[in-house]
Structure formats: C-alpha cells, structure tokens
C-alpha cells in the first residue's frame, strides 16, 4: 500500500507532524536552561558554575545514552524507546519542583531530563525522517529542525514568567504533567520506516520509480567499516567545537543580560528570540545541506554563529542584546541541522545512519557539556562574562579549518533505504569508491 488513499496523503506527513511536536516538547527543559540560572541563584544561593555543571552533566551522561539509543533504534525501532524517554522527561520535570539540594538538581535534570530522556528524541527522530522521505528531503528536514527552535520560543518566557509568578514547585509540577502526556501520545504516531506499514518512502510510491538493478535483500554497510575512515570522526569533531561555542551563549545569555541590569522576563526574551530566529536558519540550512553538502553548510554556519558574539562585548542595553539574538540566531541553527542529510549523502541509506548520527551527537554532547560549564566557571573566576565570550569566539573559529576540509559535494538524488544500491554496486567513499554526492 503506497498511500493512505482514503485521505489522499502519504503517512510520511503524519510522521513529520508528530516528530515536530515531539521535537518542540522534548526540548522544553533542555533548551530553557538559561532561564533557570538566576532563580536558582536567588532561591538557593548556589554558584553559577555549580548550576551550569548540571547543564554539562546532562550532556555528559547523555553520551553513552545517545550511543545506546542509536544502536537500539537501528535494530528494534524507535516507538518504545521514545515512549520511555517521554516518561523520563515528564517525571523528571515534575520532580524538579521538589528539589532542595544541588545534588538533587544534578540527578533530576542532569540524568533524567537532560540526558536519558532527551537523547532518544535527539538521535532517533532525524534518522526516521530521512527514511520516510525520498523527495523534498531538504525542505522536510528544514521543517523538522525549524520546529526545534520553537521549543525555547514557547518555554523560555513561559518558564520565566511562571517562576516569577507561580513559584518553583507549581511551575514544574504543571509543566511536567503536560510534557509527559504530550510526549507519550505523539510517540504513538512514529514508525521506524515505511516498510513497517507496507509503504515506500514518500516520492517512491510506484514500483516504476524505483532505481533499477537494486535489491533490498543485499547486505548493508557495516558500522565497523565506516568507523575505520576518518570522516565520521571529523564530523563529530566539527559538531563538538560548534556546540561548545554556542553552548556558552545558550546557557548564559540570559544571565549575561541580567548581569547588565536587564529585567528577568526581558532577558528571557533574548533566549526566545535566538530560538525564534534560528527557525529561519534551521530551515534554510537544511535545504543548503541537501543542495550543497556539508562543506559549505558547516563553514557558513560556524562563521555566522561566531562573528555576532563580538556584539556581546559591548552590549549594555536590551535592544543590543536583542540585536545580537537576531543576528546570532540566523546562523546558529545551521550548525546542528545538516548532519542527518550530510550522512545520507556521504554514507548512503544502507549505512547504519542511527549509529553514525549517534557518534556525531557524542561530539555535540561533549561540546555542549564543555561550553555550558566553561561559561559559568569563567564567570565565577573573573566576575564577568568577557572570558566566556572570548572562549565562544575562539572555539567557533577553530572549527572552520575542519569544515573547509570536508569533501566537495555533487548533488544527486539519494536512494531510499528499502531500495538502496548495495556497497559493492555503488561504492561508498568510506570503502574507497566514488560515492554519489562527492567530488574528488
């Protein structure tokens, strides 16, 4: 069955819609961390470096979780994994309202919410979407990653307003219950691939459209063969550096604003503005990645997220922070969104894309952990955020040579997972052959 003919649309669009909702709500706590810092300092008297360590801990604990989720998703499917992750996020958010000690914050946020809960959605959803769509992949991934930017737009000001007006306990009790319910319901709409429902990927609904001379019964490329090549590690390194650079900003820009005398809700709006404008870059850079490949995509995004940081050295008024938020957001989202598309171009759909993406997310996770902790610790040492900003700027520029060293891209139409040409018929660049999508 190629279509849900009764309704006249392909189930791939249901998967995309559900994935977007999950993407928004799964990131509620993680993407809003910056608005928690000042209330925690005021309520408990904790140091900013100690608080931001929870942000780092979430990504560090998430490293093995990301690897495990990628492996399990490739073998057993994603739905049950995401149901469990939704329960963790909902329960953890609920328990955030009951914390009284720093170690409790580390356990609930660092383990339950920010790492083990968030990891499943982060790794599995982008890979599932690449399996469901053959045509319009760049646009579809743009829609998906654009939705990721809506989470902070909604939840950063909501959390801050509720914390200031309803208190810590009531805020997290209510939001925890809502998150758990929504994540559980929408996870039920996700299926690992079109084959589960007897469908083809969107754009390959007719047998006549399938590439000739292919067979889905032929063996896929093994992960160990891919990991012997350097490009996976290079991509993971780029993701690490890029995430370290923008984690300093995302975890601390609200505190940077309040440190300069900006009111709390107004400062939270800076983070929401970054997220809102990043919707544009997440959408645009997904299309750029599909058309022009990783080299151009990652070079532009790293440069675009680094240069605006200079503005913050001179920011004292709210309008300057909002100007920064707009300029920074227009490129920062591009650093994250291209990797699933780049992987499909470089490795093909017969490769274990979930496992490959999980390796890159390890790079991202260590970068986010490092950046979040460094930003707070440098403030505690120096009493200002100048050194934190300098660290973000330097990290971004370090990633540029790595991005420029990636293979040049040559646009081709990727082959869907059910009908992909095996490695021996269309050699992967990782196995020494010329792959579609690459120019030597």
What are these regions (language model features)?
Residues 135, 144-197:
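Helix-loop-helix hairpin linking two adjacent transmembrane segments in secondary transporters
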Residues 143, 152, 347-384:
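A late C-terminal transmembrane helix in Major Facilitator Superfamily
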Residues 109-146, 348:
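Cytoplasmic helix-loop-helix junction between adjacent transmembrane helices
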Residues 172-189, 387-405:
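Symmetry-related core transmembrane helices of the 12-TM Major Facilitator Superfamily/SLC fold
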Residues 64-103, 289, 295:
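Conserved MFS/SLC helix-loop-helix module at the cytosolic interface between two early adjacent transmembrane helices
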Residues 33-38, 224-287, 371:
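Extracytoplasmic gate region of multi-pass secondary transporters
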Residues 92, 104-120, 320-334:
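Hydrophobic core of transmembrane alpha-helices in multi-pass small-molecule transporters
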Residues 245-246, 266, 272-342:
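C-terminal transmembrane helical hairpin of 12-TM major facilitator-type secondary transporters
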């Amino acid at each position: 069955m190629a279509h849900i003919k009764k309704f006249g649309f392909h189930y791939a669009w249901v998967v995309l819609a559900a994935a977007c909702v999950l993407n928004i709500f799964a990131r509620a706590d993680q993407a809003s961390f910056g608005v928690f810092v000042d209330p925690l300092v005021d309520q408990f008297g904790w140091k900013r470096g100690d608080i931001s360590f929870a942000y780092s801990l979430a990504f560090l604990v998430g490293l093995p979780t990301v690897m495990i989720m990628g492996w399990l998703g490739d073998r057993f499917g994603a739905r049950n994994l995401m149901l469990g992750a939704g329960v963790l996020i909902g329960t953890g958010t609920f328990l955030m309202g009951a914390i009284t000690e720093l170690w409790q914050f580390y356990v609930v946020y660092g383990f339950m919410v920010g790492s083990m809960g968030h990891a499943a959605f982060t790794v599995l959803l982008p890979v599932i979407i690449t399996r469901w769509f053959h045509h319009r992949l760049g646009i579809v991934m743009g829609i998906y990653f654009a939705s990721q930017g809506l989470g902070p737009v909604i939840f950063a000001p909501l959390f801050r307003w509720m914390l200031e007006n309803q208190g810590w306990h009531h805020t997290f009790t209510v939001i925890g219950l809502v998150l758990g319910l929504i994540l559980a319901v929408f996870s039920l709409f996700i299926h690992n691939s079109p084959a589960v429902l007897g469908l083809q990927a969107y754009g390959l609904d007719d047998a006549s459209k399938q590439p000739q001379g292919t067979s889905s019964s032929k063996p896929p490329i093994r992960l160990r063969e891919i990991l012997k090549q350097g490009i996976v590690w290079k991509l993971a390194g780029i993701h690490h550096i890029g995430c370290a650079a923008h984690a300093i900003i995302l975890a601390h820009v609200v505190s940077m604003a309040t440190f300069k005398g900006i009111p709390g809700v107004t400062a939270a709006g800076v983070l929401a503005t970054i997220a809102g404008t990043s919707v544009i870059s997440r959408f645009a850079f997904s299309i750029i990645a599909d058309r022009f490949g990783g080299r151009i995509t990652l070079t532009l995004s790293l440069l675009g997220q680094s240069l605006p940081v200079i503005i913050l050295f001179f920011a004292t008024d709210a309008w300057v922070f909002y100007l920064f938020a707009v300029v920074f957001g227009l490129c920062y989202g591009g650093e994250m969104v291209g990797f699933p598309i780049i992987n499909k171009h470089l490795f093909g759909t017969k490769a274990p894309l979930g496992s490959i993406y999980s390796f890159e997310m390890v790079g991202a996770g260590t970068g986010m952990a490092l950046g979040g902790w460094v930003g707070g610790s440098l403030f505690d040492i120096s009493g200002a955020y100048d050194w934190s900003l300098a660290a973000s700027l330097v990290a971004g520029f370090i990633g540029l040579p790595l991005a420029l060293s990636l293979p040049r891209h040559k646009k081709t139409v990727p082959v869907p997972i059910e009908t992909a040409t095996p490695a021996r018929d269309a050699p992967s660049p990782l196995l020494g052959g010329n792959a579609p999508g690459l120019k030597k």
